[in-house]
Structure formats: C-alpha cells, structure tokens
Amino acid sequence: MRGIILLSFVLTSCLAADAVPAAADAAAVTTTTPAGAAAAAATTATTAKANTAATTNTAAAAAAAADTLTTKGTTTGTAKTTGVTTGTAKTTATTAVTSDTAVAANPATMNPSELSIYSLTVTMNQAQLQNFLATHSSGAATAGATGTSVASGASGASLEDSTTTTAAAAAGGNGAATIDDTTKGLTFVTSRTLKPSSSATSQGSAQASGSGSNASQANAAGVYSTNSVLVFVSICIGFIGGSLGI
C-alpha cells in the first residue's frame, strides 16, 4: 500500500516539472506592441526609408530613359551596328585565307637557267611553247621571236645552251616582255684532210728512189695548201664575228 502511494507521488512530481517549461515558452513568444512615443518613432522611420528609396529609384529610371531614347539612342545604335558589320567582314577575310597562292610559271620572265630547268618539267613542242609565251606575258611577247630554240623529242621540249632569252619590262610599266634572241656563240666544225698535190705526186712517182729533196717538196706543197685553207677560214670567222658584234 505504501509502495503504491509512493509511486503515485513520484509520477505527480514528474508531470508538474514538465509543465513549467511549457509555460515559460508560451511567455517567450508573446509580443508586446510599443505604445506612445516609441510607436510613433518606429512608424516614422519606416515611412522615411520607403519614401527615400522610391524617390531615388524613380529619378534614376527617368534619367536613364531620357538619355537612352532621346539623346543617344539613335546615334549609339548606328555606330554599334557599323562596327559589328566591319568586324565580321574582317574576320571572314582572315579566316578564308588558309594558304599562300601559287604563282603560275611565266617563261617570258625567266632567265636562261630558269628556262632550261622549266623546259625539262613541261612537255611542249615548239608551237605550244610559242603559244604559251604569247598568252602568258601580258599579250606583248611576240610568237615569232621568242628567243628559245626547241628540239622536239620523246622527253618533251629542251633548250639549246647557245641561245639566251631576256625579258624586260616595257617603258609604260605594263609588264610587257621584250625577247632578245641574239645568238651569242658560234660553233664551227671543220674536217681537214691533207692530200698531196698533183705535182708532188708526179715528182714522187718519177723519183721512186726516195730522195729527200722530192719528199721535202711534196711536204712543202701540202703545208702551203693547208695554210691557205686555214687563212681563208680565219678571215671568214672574223668577218662573221664583226657583223654580229661578237
């Protein structure tokens, strides 16, 4: 009996202890409205802040709108549009150039060494090369005097070493080419056979004994004939060289 009473007392004490904080929490969330002068001051401060913010925002928005629409709107917009268009065009041009453009070969502007190399890389006969020079030298190169000696063969066109081709710009500066086909070198191929004269032969036959005087006379006649031929050839070469200005 005593135990039951004691247990009831303990339970009652615990329930009473839990009820006290609940009451304290209820008292903590209770708000009190300021009265009198404090309430008026709080209302005034709130109103002043709201009015200041509204006035400032409205003035800034009005100034920005006036500046954009009436003063700088059209002028600024046009300048920006032009700038963007120009920039796009420049970017496109830069992007389109991806590699260097190869310049077409023009024999009319080549020196003899370059022409010799070029002739080994193309397969043109004389007529084709003449036509190429006439159509790729600004229309001023003459097809009849190109200054190139071409020998047709299975391997294509080849140039002789004895000819030179020079291209010079015309006085007007229009890129016209003048071809100089002057021959700079002459090659003479001669074959010479020493034959005894008829008089030397008859003397040699008559004097079969082989005397030294007859042999000397025959040799002298042959040498005289040979010297005459050489002198004649030298005179011809000198005359031709003087005519050509060599």
From Swiss-Prot:
Glycan-modified residues: 214
Keyword Signal: yes
Annotated keywords: Cell membrane, Glycoprotein, GPI-anchor, Lipoprotein, Membrane, Signal
Subcellular location: Cell membrane
One GO cellular component term noted in the UniProt record for this chain: plasma membrane
Propeptide: 220-246
Signal sequence interval, chain numbering: 1-16
UniProt feature coiled coil, ranges: none
Name of this chain's protein: Predicted GPI-anchored protein 33
Gene name linked to the record: PGA33
